């Protein structure tokens, strides 16, 4: 009866509700104990959020299983989660959480997660923990975001040299950190102990232990452990987190034959949305992130849905995933951005939310001409984050072409023109703030030039910028909005071939075809393509230059800024006369110049799916790429000065180098980022621009991803 009443209360107002499973019933946990979990128990956590429309709610339902919880409790929590999901009409996104391997969404619910020894079977209940008498508790503080405070047995062997500990004896609270513990964990242990002190309203004293064998602490520790300090503390293991694997597979769960079967649909990601059908339940197993998604078709049977929501060992064996994998259950129509990013051109009717933009996978959404007001960037950080802009590009620009082991200045009259067979360094000096170095790699650049490019960029960073510049790697075709703004409103032009003359220009072909696309604030790229009709595209405008005359071809989907961009390109290339023709109204001479009429792309470009930015802390401690994803509600204080952080904004990657990051990480982070992009299963371009900068030199486009950025936070 208690369970039915609690389910009726679930999800009716915004906030977090938590229940512990006691004798197969839901028992609410007081808000003062949210974030504290007994390792012998299982819990349901429901987060309710109001829709932006104001008409209803959306829910994230987590069912958490402690490492020491019984099989009955684990089964009960899954069954009760399904009941709550049914009560909410299948609307929640469900997450199976295993102690120590919780999802980023779960970790984002609590500033600290505390694991308490015992459980309901041992008589432990969630009561106000502010008593100061008869206490003896040893807590290990480990991890980053959030910190995990785990009660451990009161033995000397529970200590390691890489973690921090809190010795709680009621009226006295002691903090000790191993010599290899990070600064971050040391500070968090102090904060955790200070929180215990505050709970006791001044009835406890806080002390710091510098050495386990000094005179002041020797007596206390002997009383606490029941024996003297053994003389040494063992080494601890690193808090290893997410390791990239290799496979991403899609399975179908169906009981159409009368027997529940799991069959492989595809192991070639990104998948097609058409691989899913409403009549069945599907499982997407991502071994690269140890994450399992269960997609519930709206017409799938309850048996199919329940089998995936409460999986047994055979389920994990069948899909070749570890038992500790994160598991997220999604209703049809309630797919998360991370799930949709593993499909090509997912079509959704749901509105976009958050800082993420709608980006296309291997496509580019065009933007009509608009006025860009750089003054709003400082007052509107979100705008800076969305636009990837630091200013309006009106500062000073200097460009060099990289030739083998040297760089050559590009004549100013050729600024904005690049050759696809070359590499370039663009140094931008804004009117305020640090310099920006774009190092641009043409798609046809030689291996020698591609190798020399980062070396010459590093040299430029030291000699021209005094070591004070953001460095942004750009591959042809992925130029970020700010780089597009550096050429006085003119198109960015990319020619075929490479530079072979001292003037910085290569001899042009007699017939040339330039594809013109509009992007941020109406700025255009004009890219030379082979002069064949098969390279036309109905979505764009084209400039065709021939010995007998020139044409601007206007595709049916071209916007005004693209037509103007084609005109501007003609002017830059000294083409004073041209004929403007619309698609399907071409003269014979036009097709003759292109080698005859043939098929070309005529379909409208599709928009991609909304993908919200993701923050990672990077590590190469094991020799493989390892990244810990920070909870989805990340804040500025999640940036760890001891580490290198990566913010994946989908079509742009930021790398933040903390002041205390070690030299090995600084030397290897580029390969770690490359591996991250290479192993991404979304199908997006592997040539995403990457911007690298030091702590304290963050661009507006980065800080705008953090609510209320504080420049003095680390002072």
Swiss-Prot record:
Ca(2+) 2 binds at residues 539-540, 562. GO terms for molecular function: actin filament binding; metal ion binding; phosphatidylinositol-4,5-bisphosphate binding. Residues 1-124 are annotated as: Actin-severing. A 1,2-diacyl-sn-glycero-3-phospho-(1D-myo-inositol-4,5-bisphosphate) binds at residues 136-145. It is found in: Cytoplasm, Cytoskeleton. The keyword Metal-binding applies. SUPFAM superfamilies: Actin depolymerizing proteins, C-terminal, gelsolin-like domain of Sec23/24. Gelsolin-like repeats lie at residues 24-75, 147-187, 260-306, 405-451, 524-564, 625-667. Keywords: Actin capping, Actin-binding, Calcium, Cytoplasm, Cytoskeleton, Metal-binding, Repeat. InterPro entries: ADF-H/Gelsolin-like_dom_sf (IPR029006), Gelsolin-like_dom (IPR007123), Gelsolin-like_dom_sf (IPR036180), Villin/Gelsolin (IPR007122). Residues 72-75 are annotated as: Actin-actin interfilament contact point. One of its GO terms (biological process) is actin filament severing. Residues 384-715 are annotated as: Actin-binding, Ca-sensitive. Ca(2+) 1 binds at residues 421-422, 449, 499. Ca(2+) 3 binds at residues 642, 665. Predominantly in the body wall muscle, but expression is not restricted to muscle cells. Induction: Interaction with actin is suppressed by PIP2. The keyword Coiled coil does not apply. GO terms for cellular component: actin cytoskeleton; cytoplasm. Belongs to the villin/gelsolin family. Calcium-regulated, actin-modulating protein that binds to the plus (or barbed) ends of actin monomers or filaments, preventing monomer exchange (end-blocking or capping). It can promote the assembly of monomers into filaments (nucleation) as well as sever filaments already formed. This is Gelsolin, cytoplasmic.
């Amino acid at each position: 009866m208690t369970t039915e009443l609690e389910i009726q209360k679930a999800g009716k107002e915004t906030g977090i509700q938590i229940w512990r499973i006691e004798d197969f019933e839901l028992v609410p946990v007081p808000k003062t104990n949210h974030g504290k979990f007994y390792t012998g128990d299982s819990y349901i956590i429901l987060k309710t959020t109001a829709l932006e429309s104001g008409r209803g709610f959306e829910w994230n339902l987590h069912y958490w299983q402690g490492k020491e919880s019984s099989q009955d409790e684990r089964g009960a929590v899954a069954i009760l989660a399904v009941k709550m999901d049914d009560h909410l009409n299948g609307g929640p996104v469900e997450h199976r959480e295993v102690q120590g391997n919780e999802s980023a969404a779960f970790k984002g619910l609590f500033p600290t997660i505390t694991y308490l020894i015992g459980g309901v079977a041992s008589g432990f209940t969630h009561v106000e923990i502010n008593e100061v008498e008869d206490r003896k508790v040893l807590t290990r503080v480990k991890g980053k975001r959030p910190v995990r405070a785990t009660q451990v047995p009161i033995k000397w062997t529970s200590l390691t040299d890489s973690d921090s500990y809190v010795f709680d004896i009621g009226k006295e609270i002691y903090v000790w950190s191993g010599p290899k513990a990070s600064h971050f964990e040391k500070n968090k242990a102090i904060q955790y102990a200070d929180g215990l002190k505050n709970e006791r309203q001044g009835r406890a004293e806080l002390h710091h232990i510098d050495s386990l064998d000094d005179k002041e602490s020797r007596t206390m520790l002997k009383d606490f452990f029941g024996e003297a300090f053994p003389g040494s503390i063992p080494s601890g293991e690193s808090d290893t987190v997410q390791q990239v694997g290799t496979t991403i597979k899609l399975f179908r769960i169906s009981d159409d034959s009368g027997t529940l079967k799991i069959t492989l649909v595809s192991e070639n990601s990104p998948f097609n949305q058409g691989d899913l059908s409403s009549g069945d339940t599907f499982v997407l197993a991502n071994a690269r992130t140890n994450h399992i998604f269960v997609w519930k078709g709206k017409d799938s049977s309850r048996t199919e849905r329940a089998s995936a929501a409460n999986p047994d060992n055979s389920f994990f064996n069948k899909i070749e995933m570890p038992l500790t994998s994160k598991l997220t259950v999604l209703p049809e129509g309630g797919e998360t951005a991370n799930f949709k990013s593993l499909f090509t051109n997912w079509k959704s009717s749901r509105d976009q939310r958050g800082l993420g933009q709608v980006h296309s996978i291997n496509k580019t959404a065009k933007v009509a001409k608009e006025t860009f007001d750089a003054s709003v960037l400082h007052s509107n950080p979100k705008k800076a984050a969305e636009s990837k802009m630091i200013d309006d590009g009106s500062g000073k620009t200097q460009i060099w072409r990289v030739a083998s082991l040297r760089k050559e200045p590009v004549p100013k009259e050729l600024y904005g023109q690049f050759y696809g067979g070359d590499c370039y360094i663009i140094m931008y000096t804004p009117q305020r703030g640090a310099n920006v170095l774009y190092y641009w790699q043409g798609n046809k650049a030689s291996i020698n030039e591609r190798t020399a490019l980062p070396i010459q960029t590093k040299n430029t960073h030291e000699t021209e910028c005094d070591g004070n510049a953001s460095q942004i790697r750009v591959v042809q075709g992925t130029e970020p909005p700010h780089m597009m703004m550096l050429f006085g409103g003119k198109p960015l032009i990319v020619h075929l071939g490479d530079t072979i003359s001292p003037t910085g220009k290569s001899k042009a072909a007699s017939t040339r075809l330039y594809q013109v696309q509009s992007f941020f604030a109406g700025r255009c790229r004009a890219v030379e393509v082979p002069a064949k009709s098969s390279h036309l595209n109905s979505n764009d405008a084209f400039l065709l230059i021939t010995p007998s005359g020139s044409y601007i071809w206007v595709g049916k989907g071209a916007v005004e800024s693209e037509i103007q961009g084609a005109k501007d390109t003609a002017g830059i290339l000294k083409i004073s006369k041209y004929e403007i023709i619309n698609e399907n109204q071409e003269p014979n001479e036009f097709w003759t110049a292109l080698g005859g009429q043939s098929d070309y792309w005529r379909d409208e470009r599709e928009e991609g799916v909304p993908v919200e930015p993701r923050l990672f802390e990077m590590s190469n401690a094991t020799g493989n790429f390892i990244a810990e994803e920070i909870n989805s509600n990340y804040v500025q204080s999640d940036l760890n000065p001891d580490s290198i952080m990566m913010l994946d904004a989908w079509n742009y990657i930021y790398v933040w180098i903390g002041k205390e990051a070690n030299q090995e990480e600084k030397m290897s982070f580029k390969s770690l980022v490359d591996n991250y992009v290479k192993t991404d299963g979304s199908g997006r371009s592997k040539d995403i621009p990457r911007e690298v900068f030091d702590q304290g030199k963050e661009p507006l486009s980065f800080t705008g991803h953090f609510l209320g950025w504080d420049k003095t936070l680390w002072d």
